[in-house]
Amino acid sequence: MRYPVDVYTGKIQAYPEGKPSAIAKIQVDGELMLTELGLEGDEQAEKKVHGGPDRALCHYPREHYLYWAREFPEQAELFVAPAFGENLSTDGLTESNVYMGDIFRWGEALIQVSQPRSPCYKLNYHFDISDIAQLMQNTGKVGWLYSVIAPGKVSADAPLELVSRVSDVTVQEAAAIAWHMPFDDDQYHRLLSAAGLSKSWTRTMQKRRLSGKIEDFSRRLWGK
């Protein structure tokens, strides 16, 4: 199955309280180089929590925009791609039918699903909606991130094509394990066994198993 894709990149900008972000992106056409760190011309702020080899690309399903426009009718005009800061936008791929570790061919490159996107408080400023990061997490409409396992030239003219599936954990299930379920060591083990899981999510699940408790999400979701 092949999925046509729209492609977006962005530059770092200042947001309220002086926090930088590259969430504002623009559509790009033509050929780009995709490296292990992401798309040519795309920037990430605060690289401790954004970007890097495990989180080189962000994918957000176009299907979700109608949901958000209905939830916030007064701001409906905001909810068009790439409003959530995604690099890739498609129809037909969602958290329910994409699996952890899925490998897609994109042009000359190969990319692998590494984790659900962990929404952060900068989205609240970006949309001027105080709790949209929390709402994304609650609904599971978060999208997902990729690592780049084979760099190469890519473009919006090259569709995504699934070439390998080795996991039984969907992105939707991974998000539920991480954020919605009570402490469950067996589910953490299941998630840790999923191919390609990012280092940051691996550390988080390992810490939970060692500590016996779930970490606080408030700093990521609210910035405090």
Curated annotation (Swiss-Prot):
Q: Which superkingdom?
A: Bacteria
Q: Name one GO cellular component term.
A: cytosol
Residue ranges of every copy of the MOSC domain listed in the record: 26-163
Give this protein's Gene Ontology molecular function annotations: molybdenum ion binding; oxidoreductase activity; oxidoreductase activity, acting on other nitrogenous compounds as donors; protein homodimerization activity; pyridoxal phosphate binding
Report the InterPro entries cross-referenced here: Benzoxazolinone_Detox_Enz, MoCF_Sase_C, Pyrv_Knase-like_insert_dom_sf, YiiM-like_3-alpha_domain
One GO biological process from the UniProt record? toxin catabolic process
Database matches in Pfam families: MOSC (PF03473), YiiM_3-alpha (PF03475)
Among NCBIfam families, the record links this protein to: PRK11536.1 (NF008577)
State whether it acts alone or in a complex, and with which partners, per the record: Monomer.
What protein am I looking at? Answer: Protein YiiM
